[in-house]
Amino acid sequence: MVKENDYVAIFHSIHRVLKAEKILKHEEVSFLLIPVPRQLTSDCGLALRFSPDVKTELLAILADEGLPPAELFQRSGGAYLDASSQL
């Protein structure tokens, strides 16, 4: 379950999301690997869920590794808002 205001980062391949997981675990950034919520579509069935508190750090690490998410959404009011412009 995705909490209110949390972010969901989607990668369009299982390889990329698993690589992101490995990098973020090494960097000790707080996140969860989750199934992509039904309301969102993706070629990959997994996504990263993280809080607004770690958003800047997490996205910077992934960008430095050349592994930015393909899409970014934020849970707000029970819906997922497209936050890809924040990438």
Which sequence ranges carry the predicted segments?
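Short secondary-structure transition/capping segments
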Residues: V2, C44-L46, D82-S85
